[in-house]
Regions:
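Reverse-transcriptase-like RNA-dependent polymerase core
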Residues: 162, 177-215, 259-269, 310-329
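Non-catalytic, polymerase-adjacent accessory regions of viral genome-replication enzymes
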Residues: 1-207
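Conserved NTP-donor binding/palm subdomain of two-metal-ion nucleotidyltransferases/polymerases, i.e.
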Residues: 426-455
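Short helix/loop capping segments that flank catalytic or ligand/cofactor-binding pockets
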Residues: 216, 229-230, 242, 283-286, ...
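Active-site-proximal segment of RNA-dependent polymerases
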Residues: 220-283, 344, 357
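Glycine/proline-rich, flexible active-site/cofactor-binding loop segments
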Residues: 205-249, 320-337, 346
Length: 455
């Protein structure tokens, strides 16, 4: 990764900050310890899973695909806390900047319009006030730049806030009554200006029984102020979708189960259901995908000045924000989806939904409306659907998909890590089954160290 000296660290962070330096020391050095919980103390992971398999294997006669689903996740159970040193993670960071450059075509207007039509019940959303937005936000997480402390410690230093390109303006004396956050009564003695920067973080995910099997996901820790501005739209957007059950996963798992049931009950008997699997969806979330999400949002929001300014000034931040990846080092440039954005899930869900519609439109068919997606996770069907249709359509927009990882079946599907089968029902509903092997793994392993005495 090339060094970039365009942004000085002191312009993005309130220094000195011992906590920030200590944090980046850990990022640079990594974390080699495996943290186990007290559950099944004294037993190896393989021993616990083997003992449990005696209860699961008898199900293979009646529900073979359920046991296949369980065994697939059994192979991935293992440590989650191992963190590689930064020097071994640079390639993962590069993917965010490189993968958006793959050949891509715009998502079709007809597909975007289909999603807009699906969202017509909630059209006219007006951005929420900053005060109400902050009241609903979690305050126990890190505030990111510039203060890098708990959010609750710097609410007063952050509110009210605005942005100007890559500049975040904090502690403004007031928010305009018309929610025009780009106009303020200037008070240089009170307000402060900082270059915005996301902070490199990580999430550990099980990938197998060995220490080097741990999957390390790049996390972009966003500035508190940027999240506030983003959530002025994404909070009411998600709440409106929940009200009309437009995205079942934003409502509840029960809503997902009901929609899956409708999908199986309305699809053709010989039509397959395809559970899509992307390779590095965040990293490949390029300008074509970004524009699809923005186009949909532009029709869901009202036509006010604040909405227009939000689309032009706040929406793009998650794709352009600089990344502080080490102490004193900040990388700039356009990139894929920053995971710590307040709109990550929403943008990806809207764009992914457009891909589902486009796939059916290209096949001259109608997407089964009970198809679903959330972020990069999706399940879809329409008459005559094939996995080749899906891959051909999705990869046209710069996405990478491995054909062998797409799950295809007429009777069952896996969505949001839960297995559903058209014949496995409770009170008529195709309820989802979470992997018991994965659950056992989460009971035994932890991503961070927690003192068992204060759990």
């Amino acid at each position: 990764m090339p060094k970039n000296n365009e942004i000085k660290f002191v312009d993005a962070f309130n220094l000195p900050n011992p906590g920030l330096r200590s944090y980046f020391d850990i990022v640079e050095e990594g974390q080699p310890e495996e943290y186990r919980t007290t559950f099944a103390r004294g037993k190896s992971i393989s021993q616990v899973l083997q003992e449990w398999s005696n209860y699961l294997e008898p199900l293979s006669r009646e529900w073979p695909t359920l046991v296949d689903f369980e065994n697939d996740l059994k192979a991935k159970v293992g440590p989650m806390s191992i963190m590689k040193p930064l020097k071994h993670r640079m390639e993962d960071i590069d993917h965010y900047y490189d993968d958006i450059l793959l050949s891509s075509t715009p998502v079709s207007d007809s597909a975007v319009k289909a999603v807009i039509a699906e969202m017509k019940q909630i059209a006219g959303i007006h951005p929420r006030s900053q005060q109400k937005t902050v009241d609903l936000m979690k305050k126990s997480t890190n505030s990111g730049s510039p203060y890098f402390t708990k959010r609750r410690n710097v609410v007063d230093k952050t509110m009210f806030c605005s942005v100007d390109n890559l500049l975040q303006i904090l502690n403004l004396p007031r928010e305009d009554k018309n929610l025009d956050i780009w106009t303020w009564a200037d008070d240089p003695d009170q307000s402060s200006e900082w270059i915005m920067a996301a902070v490199l973080g990580w999430r550990g995910q099980e990938g197998g029984p060995k220490r080097n099997d741990v999957k390390q996901r790049v996390v972009w820790m966003f500035p508190f102020a940027v999240n506030i501005l983003e959530l002025q739209v994404y909070q009411p957007l998600i709440e409106s979708c929940q009200r009309f059950n437009l995205v079942p996963a934003w409502v509840s798992m029960e809503a997902v189960d009901q929609r899956i049931t409708k999908m199986f009950d309305t699809k053709g008997k010989n039509d397959v259901v395809i559970c899509t699997d992307f390779s590095k969806f965040d990293q490949h979330f390029n300008s074509s995908m970004q524009q699809a999400a923005k186009s949909i949002l532009s029709k869901v929001l009202d036509h006010s000045y604040i909405s227009e300014n939000w689309l032009n000034g706040v929406f793009p931040i998650k794709y352009e924000i600089p990344l502080a990846y080490d102490y004193g080092k900040i990388r700039v440039g356009k990139h894929g989806m920053g995971s710590g954005s307040g709109g990550t899930n929403a943008d990806e869900t809207l764009a992914h939904r457009a891909l589902q519609y486009e796939c059916a439109i290209k096949a001259k068919q109608r997407l089964n409306p009970n198809s679903q997606c959330l972020g990069d996770d999706g399940v879809l069907t329409f008459p005559g659907i094939t996995v080749e249709d899906v891959i051909r359509s999705y990869t046209a927009h710069g996405q990478e998909m491995n054909e062998s990882k797409q799950y295809v079946s007429k009777q069952d599907c896996v969505y949001l890590r839960r297995w559903h089968h058209t014949n496995y029902r409770q009170n008529g509903v195709c309820v989802g089954v979470y992997s018991t092997y994965r659950a056992l793994g989460r009971l035994m392993e932890q991503e961070r160290y927690y003192d068992p005495e204060i759990w």
